């Protein structure tokens, strides 16, 4: 039994476990205390002071930071006294004194935690006029822009980057000159940044944001010479709805497809189809390596953030990486080869757009070593869920009112195995569903067989019997957990045959391109689990749940590739990797 502490908050008696903070105690009785720097279990530093409350422990009232101040027996707390209100308002005014206040043109306007608090506390813009250092925009990275003129020094991005074991950003200088930058004052694109975008989704303001590629898409849609096709990743269908007021994890596939068609795309396709294609290639690759005992463990290659992490920090594992392109890359490849041939089109006239929950996909789209057609990129523009939402709103489409629509052929039919790619463990489970039937020759009837790889835990392990042979697998999400697994493999402590790694904690549902959830919600709701529920529900409701049973995938092999792992498939659907320096 936990020792309990009794206190009063705003006159209400509260009993909470010893070690709880005032913030947590207040939350337990329905009192929300505002924060800016606080991220539960990740950035508990009490730096912003927005969470100040008055606490009396028998020595008179004192203003304390509730996010780090522990409760004590008999404590009396006021969360909304006149002194507290004044202190919070003054703190906000001081933050604004050095803040770039171009709110109307800021990408986070309407979804800015600082803006929201300033509105709630009636803060006026020009109470204090502080010295404002002026910073140049850092546009050096392929996926994002850093605008330190809007930074409030909350260090949430630093915590997110450290959590990923990348740690390429931190506090530089002191006093008024303090800024969040890169080691040695390098530009972000000159560091070992892996483009995951976790810093973006954890930033409370507009200091970090994805590079906006929507103008490229608008121009392509307006070009009569271009055939513009779009693919949507699995996690998009459970994220996009949040931008239009739906509950977290709501499946909005039909409305998403309808909106894309209204935007003018010539073909609206499902990346889940390409995920099924990936499984066909990856399962074949795994069985080939497993039977030969070569380059094991096989490690998945669907997450470009993980791939870049491996290239920068663990190049010794490059031989273990699957040579399969990611589903985004595979779709682009088949669009500019098989689809072009089938439709009688010149590949250079096809403009492929990806809607992804991931900022690292922008980096992947720029990789010249991934092209299926010489001189042409597989992907012409990769946009985030947030960018798509802005396009839909800009076009005046009433997302909630439009009728549902279906994906187009020949890349519109997909299995539930492709759907669960968006959740951590999904790629592994999808591959095992196919590998099981290929190896045993038996029908997989119980889909709970591989449930051990589900869930948001950072590292999951399982051993499965495939026709009398044991296969040891591991799943890691978040690069801190990937590091743990890789170090155990290096030391010989663990031996696995197959490893799935996703750069973002929880997988693509928690990607750097997903809708940004304010810390006031994400501190108390498991965003990863809520969005993943939608994907597993979608999988359960689909009539087709195994990649190798997808008739559209079978048609691609029958008409074009021959068989999984063929020479043609390797040329178009597979790739290589490059060792990179850290700085």
List where the protein language model places each region:
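Fe-S ferredoxin-like electron-transfer domains
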Residues: 49-195, 208-223, 227
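Cysteine-centered loop/knuckle micro-motif
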Residues: 161, 203, 252
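Residue-level recognition of oxygen-bearing side chains
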Residues: 21, 156, 198
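Structural motif corresponding to the C-terminal cap of alpha-helices
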Residues: 165, 203, 339-343
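Canonical Radical SAM [4Fe-4S] cluster-binding loop centered on the CxxxCxxC motif
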Residues: 195-202
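Iron-sulfur-associated redox domains of electron-transfer enzymes in respiratory
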Residues: 2-6, 13-84, 211-583
């Amino acid at each position: 039994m936990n020792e309990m502490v009794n206190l009063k908050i705003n006159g209400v008696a509260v009993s909470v476990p010893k070690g709880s903070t005032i913030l947590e105690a207040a939350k337990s009785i329905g009192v929300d205390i505002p924060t800016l720097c606080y991220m539960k279990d990740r950035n508990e530093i009490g730096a912003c002071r927005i969470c100040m409350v008055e606490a009396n422990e028998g020595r008179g009232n004192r203003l304390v930071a509730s996010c780090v101040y522990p409760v004590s027996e008999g404590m009396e707390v006021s969360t909304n006294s006149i002194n507290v209100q004044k202190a919070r308002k003054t703190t906000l005014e001081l933050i604004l004194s050095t803040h770039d206040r171009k709110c109307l043109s800021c990408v986070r306007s309407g979804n800015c935690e600082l803006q929201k608090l300033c509105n709630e506390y009636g803060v006026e813009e020009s109470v204090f006029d502080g010295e404002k250092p002026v910073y140049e925009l850092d546009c050096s990275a392929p996926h994002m822009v850093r605008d330190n003129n809007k930074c409030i020094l909350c260090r949430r991005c630093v915590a997110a980057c450290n959590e990923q074991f990348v740690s390429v950003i931190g506090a530089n200088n002191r006093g008024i000159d303090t800024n969040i930058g890169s080691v040695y004052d390098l530009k972000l694109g000159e560091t070992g940044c892996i483009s995951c975008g976790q810093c973006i989704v954890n930033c409370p303001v507009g200091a970090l944001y994805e590079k906006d590629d929507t103008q490229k898409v608008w121009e392509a849609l307006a070009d009569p010479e271009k055939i513009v096709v779009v693919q949507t990743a699995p996690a998009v269908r459970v994220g996009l709805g949040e931008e239009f007021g739906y509950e977290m994890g709501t499946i909005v596939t039909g409305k998403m497809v309808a909106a894309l068609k209204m935007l003018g795309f010539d073909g609206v396709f499902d990346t889940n189809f390409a995920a099924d294609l990936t499984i066909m290639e990856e399962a074949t690759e795994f069985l080939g390596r497993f039977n030969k005992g070569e380059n094991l463990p096989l490690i998945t290659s669907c997450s470009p953030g993980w791939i870049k992490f491996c290239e920068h920090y663990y190049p010794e594992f490059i031989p273990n990486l699957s040579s399969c392109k990611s589903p985004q890359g595979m779709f682009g490849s088949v669009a500019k080869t098989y689809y072009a041939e089938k439709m009688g089109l010149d590949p250079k006239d096809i403009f492929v757009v990806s809607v992804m929950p991931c900022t690292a996909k922008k980096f992947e789209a720029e990789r010249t070593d991934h092209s299926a057609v010489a001189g042409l990129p597989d992907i012409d523009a990769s946009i985030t869920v947030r960018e798509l939402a802005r396009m839909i709103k800009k076009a005046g489409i009433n997302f909630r009112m439009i009728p549902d629509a279906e994906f187009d052929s020949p890349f519109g039919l997909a299995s539930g195995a492709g759907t669960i790619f968006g959740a951590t463990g999904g790629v592994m489970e999808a591959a095992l569903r196919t590998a099981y039937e290929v190896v045993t020759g038996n029908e997989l009837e119980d889909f709970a067989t591989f449930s051990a790889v589900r869930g948001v835990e950072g590292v999951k392990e399982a051993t499965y019997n495939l026709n009398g042979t044991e296969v040891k697998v591991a799943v890691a999400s978040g690069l801190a957990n990937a590091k743990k697994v890789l170090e155990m493999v290096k030391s010989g402590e663990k031996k696995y045959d197959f490893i799935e790694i996703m750069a973002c904690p929880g997988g693509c549902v928690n990607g750097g391109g997903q809708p940004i959830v304010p810390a006031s919600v994400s501190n108390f709701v498991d965003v990863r689990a809520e969005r993943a529920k939608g994907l597993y529900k979608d999988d359960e409701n689909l009539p087709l749940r195994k990649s190798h049973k997808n008739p559209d995938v079978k048609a691609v092999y029958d008409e074009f590739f021959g068989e999984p792992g063929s020479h043609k498939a390797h040329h178009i659907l597979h790739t290589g990797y490059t060792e990179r320096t850290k700085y």
